[in-house]
Amino acid sequence: MADTCFRLHTEFEPTGDQPEAIGQIVANLGHGVRDQVLLGVTGSGKTFTVANVIAACNRPALILAPNKTLAAQLYNEFRALFPDNAVEYFVSYYDYYQPEAYVPASDTYIEKDSSINDNIDKLRHAATHALLTRRDVVIVASVSCIYGLGSPEYYARLVIPVECGQRFSMDALMTRLVEVQYQRNDFDFHRGTFRVRGDVLEVIPAYHHERALRIEFFGDDIDAISEIDPLTGEVLGSVGKTVIYPASHYVSDRDNLVRAMSDIRDELGERLREYQSANRLVEAQRLEQRTMLDLEMMEELGYCNGIENYSRHLDGRAAGQPPSCLLDYFPDDFLLFVDESHITVPQVGAMYKGDRSRKSTLVDFGFRLPSALDNRPLEFAEFLTRINQTVYVSATPGKWELDRSQGVIAEQIIRPTGLVDPVVEVRPTRGQVDDLLAECRARAARDERVLITTLTKRMAEDLTEHLGNMGLSVRYLHSDIDTMERMAIIQALRRGECDVLVGINLLREGLDIPEVSLVSILDADKEGFLRSTGSLIQTFGRAARNAAGRVILYADTVTASMRAAMDETARRRERQQAWNEANGIEPRTIRKSLDTPFDAIYSAASEGGKGKGRGRGRQAAPAVENVAEYGTSPEDMAKHIQKLEREMREAAKELEFERAATLRDRIRLLRERLIEA
């Protein structure tokens, strides 16, 4: 394993509160402190602080983010800071995912259906490959990192080392490649496949798509190894020796597969006896038919669809024992940084229960063996046993993180840019819509943007319609919009294609929009989750990247949460102003590229690796969509996708499954066009 040092590339030096925060965190890590909090306001450079800590400690790091959008943003930032090191991205590789489920009330079985993004799958393989081959690794991940992944022991054991001069026949190498789930394809050469031309074998590893390996044979000996461009065949360089890693994380050697299949048959027999003794013959027949079909496929091909449901047997785990996951690929001394910890920590704790509820129904009614329950995310307690030293990063850390860290907090209030927290003003609710309309028009005249947050979906819809009728360009961000469409709407706001964005609970963490100079919160005095102190502070922060930032709270009373949020914001504002005066700094609005966080990640998708379907999705040919009919801008396409999704759900509700499937395929095609746009 390569032991390369982290090299931080930046023209900036830590400033403001950053040097003290970096020094404090590094010292605590050196003294063995397991849990600590980095309390940093929006725009204070928390990512830069974390990067400096990683470079100073020189240990592998996992950055855990609450969603794909933030993970993509962090991935791009860390790649820029550590260009010479391995910065990888690990999130769910599904563009579309319908989990397997059964609804007893209507006797409806829903088959698993999904579309896998090939580029993200490549990035996941690159992440595990990096962890097994070097130590200078930063992995940016979502909660996908706690879901079951193949055993790192089997994954590492089944690598294929090749070396010039090695006695290794082509037939033997092809056999080994097939065993680790590479496919021979002499015509469509892509990631995870190999081809043969005379005495030359070429393979594209699972963790690459821009480079292939060319292995030349002389008889039964390897004569030469080189890296080539898979498209042009141009030789990029010679290689003395290399290692080919498996094409799937769920790989197993033949002996282990035979043992696992025997265990599956034993479990099947035991389960069938239970059903028969309870006179549940339908469930018994269903389970036997489905399991025997899977076993037959495993016998012939070495894998089956949904093989992850048998992962307990493949790994040799006992019933109830947690699965291997990305955390098991890290060395024991890795560092964990939990970004937006007040959201991410509860999210980690919630994953297990939701997964368990769905799978229990499948097991009870004979669609899966009980061992399928052990293909699951980690329970929260299991997650805690797998992590080492942790830094919880948030502007508003939750009670759990504060208790866990026992008061070990590094505070980062000063923004190096000099930007101060926005001025917060409370206005009465009487005439609030007309007052807000005037404020929005004033911002639009100055080419600035406005975020408005409401408490209910109905209010958001009505307000959006009213502002639109009054001549403003306004968009509504709601929970039915997926990640890519959401980013398209946000980019439209940043480009000035709309002036106002209205939402409910979607305008808090991670929305980095420097063009926003006004955040307006309606019904601010309605106490609750969306108007708690932490939620209000996070929402205020959306206006903290603009020098003219201001927050207007429409309320008839000042609640305890409002008062606490305003007092904390005022404290931070005063501290920043004092620092600015002492250092002669004039606050200036942040200038940020209009590229989305996903541009780098999805770039390969628009070059041909669009994503591969699984389940029924693979067979259905997408209908040709006349995109021009709906406009070619990302916003028009996003709106049409929303319309098609509503039609798809309605069709499924009316049991018009063929129409629903056609609509689904049109949605997939439009999403691919949206990525390209």
From Swiss-Prot:
<protein>
    <recommendedName>
        <fullName>UvrABC system protein B</fullName>
    </recommendedName>
</protein>
<dbReference type="GO" id="GO:0009381">
    <property type="term" value="F:excinuclease ABC activity"/>
</dbReference>
<feature type="binding site">
    <location>
        <begin position="40"/>
        <end position="47"/>
    </location>
    <ligand>
        <name>ATP</name>
    </ligand>
</feature>
<dbReference type="GO" id="GO:0016887">
    <property type="term" value="F:ATP hydrolysis activity"/>
</dbReference>
<dbReference type="GO" id="GO:0006289">
    <property type="term" value="P:nucleotide-excision repair"/>
</dbReference>
<keyword id="KW-0267">Excision nuclease</keyword>
<dbReference type="Pfam" id="PF12344">
    <property type="entry name" value="UvrB"/>
</dbReference>
<dbReference type="InterPro" id="IPR024759">
    <property type="entry name" value="UvrB_YAD/RRR_dom"/>
</dbReference>
<keyword id="KW-0228">DNA excision</keyword>
<dbReference type="GO" id="GO:0005737">
    <property type="term" value="C:cytoplasm"/>
</dbReference>
<keyword id="KW-0067">ATP-binding</keyword>
<dbReference type="Pfam" id="PF17757">
    <property type="entry name" value="UvrB_inter"/>
</dbReference>
<comment type="function">
    <text>The UvrABC repair system catalyzes the recognition and processing of DNA lesions. A damage recognition complex composed of 2 UvrA and 2 UvrB subunits scans DNA for abnormalities. Upon binding of the UvrA(2)B(2) complex to a putative damaged site, the DNA wraps around one UvrB monomer. DNA wrap is dependent on ATP binding by UvrB and probably causes local melting of the DNA helix, facilitating insertion of UvrB beta-hairpin between the DNA strands. Then UvrB probes one DNA strand for the presence of a lesion.</text>
</comment>
<dbReference type="GO" id="GO:0009380">
    <property type="term" value="C:excinuclease repair complex"/>
</dbReference>
<dbReference type="InterPro" id="IPR001650">
    <property type="entry name" value="Helicase_C-like"/>
</dbReference>
<dbReference type="InterPro" id="IPR027417">
    <property type="entry name" value="P-loop_NTPase"/>
</dbReference>
<comment type="similarity">
    <text>Belongs to the UvrB family.</text>
</comment>
<keyword id="KW-0963">Cytoplasm</keyword>
<keyword id="KW-0234">DNA repair</keyword>
<feature type="domain" description="Helicase C-terminal">
    <location>
        <begin position="432"/>
        <end position="594"/>
    </location>
</feature>
<dbReference type="InterPro" id="IPR036876">
    <property type="entry name" value="UVR_dom_sf"/>
</dbReference>
<keyword id="KW-0742">SOS response</keyword>
<keyword id="KW-0547">Nucleotide-binding</keyword>
<dbReference type="InterPro" id="IPR004807">
    <property type="entry name" value="UvrB"/>
</dbReference>
<dbReference type="InterPro" id="IPR014001">
    <property type="entry name" value="Helicase_ATP-bd"/>
</dbReference>
<feature type="domain" description="Helicase ATP-binding">
    <location>
        <begin position="27"/>
        <end position="414"/>
    </location>
</feature>
<feature type="domain" description="UVR">
    <location>
        <begin position="638"/>
        <end position="673"/>
    </location>
</feature>
<dbReference type="GO" id="GO:0005524">
    <property type="term" value="F:ATP binding"/>
</dbReference>
<dbReference type="Pfam" id="PF00271">
    <property type="entry name" value="Helicase_C"/>
</dbReference>
<comment type="subunit">
    <text>Forms a heterotetramer with UvrA during the search for lesions. Interacts with UvrC in an incision complex.</text>
</comment>
<dbReference type="GO" id="GO:0009432">
    <property type="term" value="P:SOS response"/>
</dbReference>
<feature type="short sequence motif" description="Beta-hairpin">
    <location>
        <begin position="93"/>
        <end position="116"/>
    </location>
</feature>
<dbReference type="Pfam" id="PF04851">
    <property type="entry name" value="ResIII"/>
</dbReference>
<dbReference type="InterPro" id="IPR041471">
    <property type="entry name" value="UvrB_inter"/>
</dbReference>
<dbReference type="InterPro" id="IPR006935">
    <property type="entry name" value="Helicase/UvrB_N"/>
</dbReference>
<dbReference type="GO" id="GO:0003677">
    <property type="term" value="F:DNA binding"/>
</dbReference>
<keyword id="KW-0227">DNA damage</keyword>
<dbReference type="InterPro" id="IPR001943">
    <property type="entry name" value="UVR_dom"/>
</dbReference>
<dbReference type="Pfam" id="PF02151">
    <property type="entry name" value="UVR"/>
</dbReference>
